[in-house]
Amino acid sequence: MRAVSLFLAAVPLASVAGYSTGRHPDAYHDFHERELLRRNIVYDGSIASSYDYVIVGGGTAGLVLASRLSENSNTSVLVLEAGDTGEAVQDKIDIPSYTYYNSLVGSSYDWAYETVAQPDADNRQISWPRGKVLGGSSAINGMYLVRPSELEINAWASLVPNGSIWNWDNMYAAMKKSETYTPPLSNVQDTAKIEYSNSSHGFSGPLHASYPGYMMPQVGDWTPSLNNIDIMTSPNPDGGDGWGAFVATSAINPANWTRSYSRSAYIDPLPPRANLAILPNATVTRIVFANATGGLTATGVQYASQKGATESTVSVNKEVILAAGAIGSPQILMVSGVGPQDVLEAAGVAVQVALPGVGQHLQDHLYAEVTWKTNEQTAGSMFYGNYSNLNDVPTTSTPFLSFINSATAYVNFSALIAAPETYAQQIADAVDSSASTLVPSQYSEVVEGYKAIYNLTAQKLLLSSIGDMEILLSLTGAGQYEPQVISIQAALQHPFSQGRLYINSSDIFEYPIIDPQYLSNNADLVMLREGLRFCRSLGNTAPLSAAMAEEISPGSSVQSDEQWETWLAQNSYTEYHPSCSCAMLPQSQGGVVDANLRVYGLANVRVADASVFPFQFSAHLQAPVYGLAEQAAELIRGTYVNADAANATSSASASSSAPSATTSASSRKSAATVLTPRVLPAALGAVAAAALAAIAL
């Protein structure tokens, strides 16, 4: 056992590594200031009758959009969030390590979705936790800030007409814009052997991106062990080439070692804005439409506090922006009459727009892990050794309590599979047979979209340097098997299996049917099997092997392909990254939104969340969702910049002639009638392009 671990085991963890940083103060976590920072949140349910923008979902993307769009004081913004504020459980949100030991999963702050039984995963129903609180899943997740690769982002941009807006240069700038990066403390960097490049980061954004204030010594063995089995260290994992081994940045505020999430980053530091209202405990029940020039137009949004409660309606002057996530956004579209015709009719919903792709192309990262006993202290064993009673845990963070798992590697197909070129060709050749048997839709458009995603994955991604398997070191899993354990996880990054979600009721409070079709394509089973073999090999490689004792799961008896496949079908789980259910694809390929994020057939409804990604990235989705939301805000503002400028001029003129006549922003309408947004040209137009260029500032 390492001496440092022996020492720490005998010391109260509140006093461990009590570094003073004083960097990047976050007023949200100054509890004396918190009351001042609640002023954009509506606690009594009183809102105006209409808003320019109604954002559905106050999660990761929704609060970014609310903050950015309300920067224009002549624009009114409302956020409707189904969950509560989270203030009653703030310590469980704020303290990073509580995501493992004292989390909100399974509480009223978790949507607690569940898949239907998965035939290729031992007929199990698999839990899908999602954050039901201001901040959404950014308030309960593992805080990884891992970006996709340049190749993946450019591949996304290539799938849709005029998709160059979403190319790497633009998304890279948007992800940098979202963050304030702080390098690791010197002792943390030395312990973990962290490599990074300042040039890949932003230093003035709302979200804090940093590292824990304390580092477990086993993390320092991570990259050397991977190097010893021919996986290189990534010197700049956030710069577009994020394959190889590294220690990931995390959404941690190093001023006080707390979680940085969309609420604490984008909303609470704001001064009071009369043009911004955030209404918690407001579940959107449907979007209200009317026929107008330019297509079906959203005129309002209905919402209720809970099932059976009286519904209220708020009018929309400009746009409805769905940011309810990969489950919520397609469900809201479907109960509003936008989706596959057969699904809507079966659920008793009047069809407004028959759009077959809504809820289709659903993808997720699936993971399993190999676990060993260890004679060394782990973060989990240290925590439970000091806090056996969770009623006595601290309510403020410390450097040790900021420790979360962050040792990562992205391993490509060629490092996992024997004869990779041959097997990749077999996968590519199977596109038609896979499409004819595995697509859960009767619509030809959805089948064509499946083929497009399949071909891109097989031909552009599979044999590239991009990691097809994420490998993670877990030092927080004490209690599941033994008091002291270490796990190495493998998570499939580019699944060939695609599923769907759909409604079977017109009632938004009835959960949709979620069917990711895990492991339905045999290639996924083979790759995850080989990923687990890689985990076992890594755990038996020095210097990491010094920490490993007996392998207890799956155990040494699991050796053959068949044994591995049987075991992983019984022991694989979501990595909490559902996406692609409102895919940005051509409508002819089952797409739901165009390159401007606008829903096909609707004049003024957009989707801006992880559901629009057309395929899974080799990354955690938090960083690209922040980038997506930053870019979406610029895109939306660019759409209306001329109209808003005219309104501002008109308002200034009226103000100068009658200075005592004031109108509250909450009741202001920017136009007497609903505005139909102009469609941006292929190049987005000079005005919108200029607005997007501001992302780089």
Language-model-detected regions and their locations in the chain:
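N-terminal redox-cofactor-binding region of secreted/periplasmic oxidoreductases
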Residues: 2-8, 12-665, 680-696
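Polybasic, lysine/arginine-rich low-complexity segments
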Residues: 668-669
